[in-house]
């Protein structure tokens, strides 16, 4: 009947709070990670904080509530590896903290429509519209948050403590510090990737030391040449030592992360467009 049965009682929601938030943990079995990615799998994960079970249609949603800095301990150890250098972990802490606060701020202030139709063109932006019951999800759609077992080194705690509360700010506004592990050698502008608006600090840049270098990738021939090349940029590395230090083990399984290939049949493309847009083009 759409309720949770617990100790012979029916509930719409259950909440379990720790007796000692510093020590008590709970274990969740078969958590799906990498949803819809090629490396999707299940993990048993251990968490701290409050656990809520909430009914949403035919599903039960598990929501973990905890302090931001505790959350970030897991994030910087799940997105990357806890064995990363202290400098990388500190930078990641500031970036992930900034991104989190920016998302919460946007949800609180935004009433923007995600779908617009202009002539024969339909534009739909996908972001945090799936998360109505909680601030952020625990997977790659937002930030990986895979529990306390990922925090395997003392330098993770040190990175959080030494950057406590630090965020990125641009012109007195909190930065939406979106990030990825690999950009393919050049980043995309915010307006053509996430939302139809300009963000001054999220512009297209080449992933190398020469900050003044510009790439014009606005033509078919230019982008084809770029994709088929193997430029000397930061994220184009096959150094096994570096990768084993900074990447979680399942990320290391993918060796062609810089240049990769995916083939779709006509039917698969049609199905994908229909699923995303709601329009059947045949």
Regions found by a protein language model. Give the residues of each.
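Conserved, single-site charged/polar hotspot
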Residues: 1-282
């Amino acid at each position: 009947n759409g309720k949770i049965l617990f100790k012979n009682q029916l509930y719409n929601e259950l909440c379990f709070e720790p007796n000692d938030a510093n020590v008590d943990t709970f274990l969740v079995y078969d958590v799906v990670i990498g949803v819809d990615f090629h490396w999707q799998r299940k993990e048993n994960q251990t968490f701290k904080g409050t656990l809520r079970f909430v009914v949403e249609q035919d599903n039960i949603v598990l929501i973990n509530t905890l302090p931001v800095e505790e959350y970030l301990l897991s994030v910087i150890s799940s997105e990357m590896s806890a064995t990363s250098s202290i400098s990388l972990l500190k930078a990641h802490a500031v970036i992930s903290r900034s991104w989190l606060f920016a998302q919460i701020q946007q949800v609180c202030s935004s009433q923007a429509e995600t779908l617009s139709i202009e002539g024969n063109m339909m534009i739909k932006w996908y972001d945090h519209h799936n998360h109505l019951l909680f601030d952020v999800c625990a997977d790659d759609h937002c930030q990986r948050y895979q529990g306390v077992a990922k925090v395997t080194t003392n330098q993770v705690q040190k990175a959080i403590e030494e950057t406590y509360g630090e965020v990125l700010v641009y012109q007195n506004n909190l930065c939406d510090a979106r990030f990825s592990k690999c950009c393919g050698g050049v980043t995309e502008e915010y307006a053509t990737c996430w939302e139809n608006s300009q963000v001054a600090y999220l512009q297209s840049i080449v992933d190398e030391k020469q900050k003044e270098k510009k790439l014009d990738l606005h033509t078919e021939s230019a982008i084809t040449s770029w994709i088929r090349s193997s430029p000397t940029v930061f994220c184009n590395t096959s150094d096994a030592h570096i990768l084993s230090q900074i990447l979680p083990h399942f990320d290391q399984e993918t060796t062609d992360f810089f240049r990769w290939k995916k083939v779709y049949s006509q039917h698969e493309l049609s199905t994908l467009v229909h699923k995303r847009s709601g329009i059947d083009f045949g």
